[in-house]
C-alpha cells in the first residue's frame, strides 16, 4: 500500500507539471502571435483589429487540421492505440503516445487561436499520458488503468483546483472501470497535483472569485432545485445540438483542415459581434459572477457563445467541453435569476446564486455525475454553504437528463472525435 501511495504522489506531481506545461505553452503562443500577456483570450480579441479577429480562429483551425490530417496520412498502415483516456481505461490501459501528443498540439493551436473549446481536454489527456508513460515503465500491467485514472483525476485537479471533484470525476463518469477501493491513490494523486499547481503558481487562490452573501432559506432552495429541473431539460438539448452540428459539418465532406478552418471562421465572424466568444469562456464566467449583466446582455452573449461552441465542437476542434458547459449553465441560471428578480428583491444576489446553480446542474445534466458536479462548483468558488441545495438540484438534473438521453457529453464527445 505504501508503494501505491508513493507512486500516486509521483503521478500527482507529473500531472501537475503536464498541466503547467500546457498552460505556459498557451501563454507563450498568445504572447508571440496575439501580443497578449493577460492570459485572457477575450482581452486578446478586444485588442485585435476586426480582420485579425475574423481570420485568427480560422487560421488556427486550419493549422490544427493540417497537423491532424498529416499525422493520419503518415500513419495509415500502423495499428492504433487509444488517444483518449476514457478509451484507454476501457481497453488495455495503453496510449498511442505520438498520436496523443499530436492531438494535444492541435488542441493547443485551436485554443490559442480563439476557438470556443475547452483547454481541459488536452490538459487531462497530457496528465493521463504522463501517468501512463510512468506506469508502463515502473509498474505491473494490471495496475496501468489505475495510474491512468490517477493521472486523469490529477489533471482535473490541476486544471480546476478541485481535487475531490477530480477524484469523483473518475468514480462517476468512468463508473465500472475501477473498484471503489482503488480511489485512495486517485485522491492522493489529485491532492498532490493541486498542491504542486499552487507551488508552481505561487498562489492558492480559488479558480473563481464570488461575492455571495445571500442566506439560504426554503425560497432559495426552491429556486435552486427549479434550476436543476430546467438544466435537466437543457442538458440533452445541448448534447443534441452538438451532435447536429457535428453531423452538419460531416455532410459538407470537407477534409479535416478545411473543416476546422470553417469552424474557426464562424467563431471569427461571431467575434465581430462580441469578442467574448473567443476562448473557453473562463474570463466571461468570472466577469458575470462579479457583476451580473442585465437580461438582454446575457441573452446576446449567450446566443453568440453557444453558436461559437457548436461551431468549434461540431467542426471537430480537439479540446474539452467542460468550461464551455460551465458558461452555458451560468447563463441559463442567470436568465432564471433575472426572471425571479422581477418579483423578488436582491436581483443581483439571486442571479449569482442561480448562476452557480446553473453551472453545477448543467454540468450534472451533461456528465451524469451529480456528486462530482456539486463538489466541482463548491471547490472552484469556495461557496460550500451551497452544497446541500446543489446536491439535490444536481441529482434532479442528472436523473431527468439521463431519462431523456442515455449518453453523457463525454461519451458523445469521445465517439465524435
Curated annotation (Swiss-Prot):
Cite the InterPro entries for this sequence.
Cl-channel_core (IPR014743), Cl-channel_volt-gated_ClcB (IPR023790), ClC (IPR001807), ClC-type_chloride_channel (IPR050368)
What GO terms fall under cellular component here? chloride channel complex; plasma membrane
The record's section on Pfam families has:
Voltage_CLC
Give me the segments passing through the membrane: 5-25, 54-74, 146-166, 168-188, 222-242, 258-278, 288-308, 316-336, 349-371, 380-400
Q: What is its main location?
A: membrane
CDD domains cross-referenced by the UniProt entry:
Voltage_gated_ClC
Keywords annotated in UniProt? Cell inner membrane, Cell membrane, Chloride, Chloride channel, Ion channel, Ion transport, Membrane, Transmembrane, Transmembrane helix, Transport, Voltage-gated channel
The family note in this entry says:
Belongs to the chloride channel (TC 2.A.49) family. ClcB subfamily.
PANTHER family in the record, alphabetically? CHLORIDE CHANNEL PROTEIN CLC-E (PTHR43427:SF6)
Function noted in UniProt: Probably acts as an electrical shunt for an outwardly-directed proton pump that is linked to amino acid decarboxylation, as part of the extreme acid resistance (XAR) response.
Name used for this protein in its record: Voltage-gated ClC-type chloride channel ClcB
Q: Which organism is it from?
A: Salmonella dublin (strain CT_02021853)
Q: Which gene encodes it?
A: clcB
Amino acid at each position: 500500500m505504501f508503494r501505491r501511495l508513493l507512486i500516486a504522489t509521483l503521478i500527482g506531481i507529473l500531472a501537475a507539471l503536464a498541466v503547467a506545461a500546457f498552460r505556459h505553452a498557451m501563454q507563450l503562443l498568445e504572447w508571440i502571435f496575439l501580443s497578449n500577456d493577460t492570459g485572457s483570450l477575450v482581452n486578446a480579441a478586444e485588442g485585435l483589429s476586426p480582420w485579425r479577429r475574423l481570420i485568427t480562429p480560422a487560421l488556427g483551425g486550419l493549422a490544427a487540421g493540417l497537423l491532424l490530417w498529416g499525422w493520419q496520412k503518415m500513419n495509415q498502415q500502423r495499428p492504433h492505440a487509444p488517444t483518449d483516456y476514457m478509451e484507454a481505461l476501457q481497453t488495455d490501459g495503453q496510449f498511442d503516445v505520438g498520436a496523443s501528443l499530436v492531438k494535444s498540439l492541435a488542441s493547443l493551436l485551436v485554443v490559442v487561436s480563439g476557438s470556443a473549446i475547452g483547454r481541459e481536454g488536452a490538459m487531462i489527456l497530457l496528465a493521463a499520458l504522463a501517468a501512463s508513460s510512468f506506469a508502463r515503465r515502473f509498474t505491473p500491467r494490471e495496475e496501468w488503468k489505475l495510474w491512468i485514472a490517477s493521472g486523469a483525476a490529477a489533471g482535473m485537479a490541476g486544471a480546476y483546483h478541485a481535487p475531490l471533484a477530480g477524484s469523483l470525476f473518475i468514480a462517476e463518469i468512468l463508473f465500472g472501470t475501477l473498484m471503489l477501493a482503488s480511489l485512495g491513490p486517485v485522491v492522493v494523486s489529485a491532492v498532490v497535483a493541486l498542491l504542486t499547481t499552487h507551488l508552481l503558481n505561487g498562489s492558492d487562490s480559488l479558480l473563481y472569485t464570488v461575492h455571495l452573501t445571500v442566506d439560504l432559506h426554503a425560497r432559495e432552495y426552491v429556486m435552486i432545485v427549479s434550476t436543476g429541473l430546467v438544466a435537466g431539460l437543457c442538458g440533452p438539448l445541448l448534447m443534441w445540438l452538438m451532435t447536429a452540428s457535428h453531423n452538419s459539418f460531416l455532410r459538407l465532406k470537407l477534409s479535416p483542415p478545411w473543416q476546422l478552418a470553417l469552424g474557426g471562421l464562424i467563431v471569427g465572424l461571431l467575434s465581430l459581434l462580441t469578442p467574448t466568444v473567443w476562448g473557453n469562456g473562463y474570463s466571461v464566467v468570472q466577469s458575470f459572477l462579479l457583476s451580473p449583466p442585465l437580461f438582454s446582455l446575457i441573452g446576446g452573449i449567450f446566443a453568440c457563445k453557444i453558436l461559437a461552441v457548436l461551431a468549434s465542437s461540431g467542426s471537430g476542434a480537439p479540446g474539452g467541453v467542460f468550461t464551455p458547459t460551465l458558461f452555458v449553465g451560468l447563463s441559463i441560471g442567470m436568465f432564471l435569476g433575472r426572471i425571479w428578480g422581477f418579483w423578488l428583491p436582491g436581483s443581483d444576489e439571486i442571479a449569482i446564486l442561480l448562476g452557480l446553480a446553473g453551472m453545477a446542474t448543467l454540468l450534472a445534466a451533461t456528465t451524469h455525475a451529480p456528486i462530482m458536479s456539486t463538489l466541482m462548483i463548491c471547490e472552484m468558488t469556495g461557496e460550500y454553504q451551497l452544497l446541500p441545495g446543489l446536491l439535490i438540484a444536481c441529482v434532479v438534473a442528472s436523473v431527468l437528463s439521463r431519462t431523456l438521453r442515455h449518453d453523457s457529453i463525454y461519451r458523445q464527445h469521445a465517439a465524435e472525435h
